[in-house]
């Protein structure tokens, strides 16, 4: 029996639409992600547990975990019956890589129980393919950080899919999920099919600045460059009073703020714990829409997916 944990992630990181993603972990040690337990069995079995298990499809063949198992068996050309327990601790449609958590944890667990027939690159390609079926297009900005850890730059080259880039260890990432759902597929549909040249140049300039600042350890420059000209102008309307929240938490002292993935989770960054705590409190009191919403002060999770049992 193998138990695997895959962490939540912040896709896009503001400036890097479909290009950047960071795995995160609350600084209090809480595991923010999904867990999957797998053991060999006589037939395929799936049990759903966890806080958000009631949001999963009743039909097991519509469950992401079943799709992962089915695709894995197809790739290795063997039918391996397994018993799987999914602990669904990530809210669906939260903008924190919920589906990626399940995909990464499941594929790594099945691969390990089968003595690793797929290598790291093959697994990552399969993760991206399954994510694409869920969201409408193949993208790695959640699965790559959840799998590999750290802050990932998505290249999608035939030989190199993703590369880890330096992150600022003194940064606190405050993430707030308001307790409502935003469909990734719908959030993608709202974006324009084409962008003006000046917007593309501006976004490229800031993305290049962020990468440069990350490697040269200029944290303030990196924070200034974390601006989203591609998705935020359109997706902000899907979030509860996002622009007001962004203005307020920047006044409190956030050095950056943006939409996590497709939303509705937002992230803010502070380089001081006291400021992070003030931002966290404001978000709890003003951004959460119901009792299921949450706020966490996080750091970048450099480990990524891991065996915990």
Curated annotation (Swiss-Prot):
Enzyme class, first EC level, given as a word: transferase
Reaction it catalyzes: L-homoserine + ATP = O-phospho-L-homoserine + ADP + H(+)
Location of the protein in the cell: Cytoplasm
Pathway named in the protein's UniProt entry: Amino-acid biosynthesis; L-threonine biosynthesis; L-threonine from L-aspartate: step 4/5
Keywords from the UniProt entry: Amino-acid biosynthesis, ATP-binding, Cytoplasm, Kinase, Nucleotide-binding, Threonine biosynthesis, Transferase
Statement: the UniProt record of this protein carries the keyword Kinase: yes
Record's GO cellular component terms: cytoplasm
SUPFAM superfamilies listed in its UniProt record: GHMP Kinase, C-terminal domain, Ribosomal protein S5 domain 2-like
Binding site for ATP: 91-101
Major place of residence: cytoplasm
UniProt-listed Pfam families: GHMP_kinases_C, GHMP_kinases_N
GO molecular function: ATP binding; homoserine kinase activity
Transferase recorded as keyword: yes
Cystine pairs: none
GO biological-process terms attached to the record: threonine biosynthetic process
EC number: 2.7.1.39
Function text: Catalyzes the ATP-dependent phosphorylation of L-homoserine to L-homoserine phosphate.
UniProt record similarity statement: Belongs to the GHMP kinase family. Homoserine kinase subfamily.
Entry protein name: Homoserine kinase
Natural source organism: Buchnera aphidicola subsp. Schizaphis graminum (strain Sg)
Highest classification ranks of the organism: Bacteria, Pseudomonadati, Pseudomonadota, Gammaproteobacteria, Enterobacterales
Gene: thrB
């Amino acid at each position: 029996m193998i138990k695997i944990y895959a962490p939540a992630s912040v896709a896009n990181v503001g400036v890097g639409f479909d290009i950047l993603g960071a795995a995160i972990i609350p600084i209090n040690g809480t595991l923010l992600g999904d867990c999957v337990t797998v053991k060999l069995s006589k037939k395929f079995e799936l049990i759903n547990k966890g806080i958000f298990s009631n949001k999963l499809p009743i039909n097991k063949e519509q469950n992401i975990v079943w799709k992962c198992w089915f695709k894995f068996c197809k790739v290795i050309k063997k039918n391996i019956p397994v018993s799987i327990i999914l602990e669904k601790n990530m809210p669906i449609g939260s903008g924190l890589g919920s589906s990626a958590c399940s995909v990464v944890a499941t594929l790594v667990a099945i691969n390990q129980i089968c003595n690793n027939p797929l290598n790291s690159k093959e697994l990552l390609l399969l993760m991206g393919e399954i994510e694409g079926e869920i969201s409408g297009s193949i993208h790695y900005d959640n699965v790559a950080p959840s799998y590999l850890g750290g802050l990932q730059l998505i290249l999608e080259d035939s030989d190199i899919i993703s590369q880890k880039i330096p992150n600022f260890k003194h940064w606190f990432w405050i993430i707030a999920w308001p307790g409502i759902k935003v469909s990734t597929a719908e959030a993608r549909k709202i974006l324009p099919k084409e962008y003006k040249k000046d917007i593309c140049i501006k976004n490229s300039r800031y993305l290049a600045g962020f990468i440069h600042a990350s490697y040269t350890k200029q944290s303030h420059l990196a924070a200034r460059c974390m601006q989203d000209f591609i998705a935020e102008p359109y997706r902000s309307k899907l979030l509860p009073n996002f622009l007001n929240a962004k203005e307020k938490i920047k006044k409190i002292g956030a050095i950056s703020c943006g939409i996590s993935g497709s939303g509705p989770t937002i992230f803010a960054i502070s380089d001081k714990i006291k400021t992070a705590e003030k931002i966290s409190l404001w978000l709890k009191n003003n951004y959460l829409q119901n009792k299921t919403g949450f706020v966490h002060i996080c750091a970048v999770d450099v480990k990524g997916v891991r065996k915990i049992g």
